[in-house]
Amino acid sequence: MEKLFNGSEYNQKVIFDHPSGLFVLFFTEMWERFSYYGMRAILVLFLTSSIMNEGWGWERADALELYALYTGLVYLTPLIGGILADKYFGYRNATVMGALIMALGHGSMALEYFSDSFFFLGIALLIIGNGLFKPNISSIVGQLYKDDDIRKDGAYTIFYMGINCGAFLGILLCGYLGEKVGWHWGFGLAGIFMFFGMLQFYFAQTIFGDVGLKPQKKVNDSNIEKTSSWPTSVEWDRISVILVFSAATIFFWWAFEQAGGSMTIFAGDYTERNLSGDSSLIFKTVNTIITIVPMVIITYVLFKLFQNIFKKYFLSNFFLGTSFVIIWGIVIWMINNEFSQEATEIPASWFSVLNSLFIIIFAPIFSKIWASKYNPSGPIKFAIGLILLGLGFAFLSYGSMSIPFGAKTASVSIFWLVFAYLFHTLGELCVSPVGLSYVSKLAPVRLVGLMFGFWLLSSAIANSLGGLTGSYICLLYTSDAADEGLGVDLGGRRI
């Protein structure tokens, strides 16, 4: 009987019409993004927080410059990681090594309380580990399917949901622990779940069969010449499309990635986050709903996976199940802690949750549209994404008009930030999953890891530019900058 999917017989067992192996990758990526976005959500806040609050007391511009360096390199190293996996390690080994190195990196950052050196060592390990992990787990997703399988687009949408489920939980919980309990608790929690994600993947990887093994295991006498040849003219055309699309996305992510930098500072210093009375109760109720509902849905997916592969891959599922028990415990503690207090202060990192929340809500809708007769072309989707991104910044710009120039703090309504995240997310849904699918479809099989590396290279450039732009915004918007003569005088107001 012919297999529906590549991989072992257990990978033929379906969940929502997709192979079980996809959901092994779903949860592995979910925990990796939990750790990445959880740490990123508190990075700038930690650096700019006062020493009295156990932060480092850095200037905003300096913190955003480090943020730019980190986020840029974290997306640059996948280019090298993709090459190493294509030629030497194989996608699965690279994924495991990257996950382990990142777990060590997060653990090192949690020790910053004892020495600053641990913090910078952790940053370096995260950059290296991400380079091995990020392009190669994405490569495995596409190879689970036959070349002509129309479900591949849907697979990347599901995978993208995993990314955002992890980001949602990571920002919510690492951010809460970091701001409310202690920064090292937030960093440490990120490391714990990166380690769980690595163990879950390692003990279930045979479900992929030959997919993602070392390159030499896939080479035989009949195809040595083919796999070692220079790309054909048709392959060069496909590679060119990937490179052009990757370059175009730089402009989108350049603006979008203000979320982890200048928009986080805006949330912390310029919005009204202290709530009491009815407004406090409403926020706590909404926060509880948006936390519990996604957790219930993700837990349901977990049980579906257990039904298919629990006996065969017991250790993998044991670690996965344990991680969910811990997560549920932290969620219940957080909700109880909030309702035990009359007033509440919304964590500045909480607003970053909105991006992931909106993706979880709207991704299924967009997936249905892309599968219908109303599916626009790639360039049209990209244009729509840019327009929606611009609308988000228009809302934010209008809402911040009341802030006096040079002000260190303000109390702008949080709804302007909510609208900004909404439109940014809708724009992201038009650009990112489409790009991942394009790379998977067009890249030559032997260069899939490298092409995903180039795709992520565009994110590296955009993240660096975004962080640097944020640092300039902070510099130009302070009264110190105005006093030093920075900016251009327009009618008595310096910009």
Language-model segments: residues:
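C-terminal ends and interior cores of transmembrane alpha-helices
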Residues: 100-114, 388-406
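Hydrophobic core of transmembrane alpha-helices in multi-pass small-molecule transporters
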Residues: 118-133, 408-428
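Intracellular juxtamembrane helix-capping segments at the cytosolic ends
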Residues: 133-146, 430-443
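Glycine-rich segments within core transmembrane alpha-helices of 12-TM secondary carriers
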Residues: 154-171, 178, 456-466
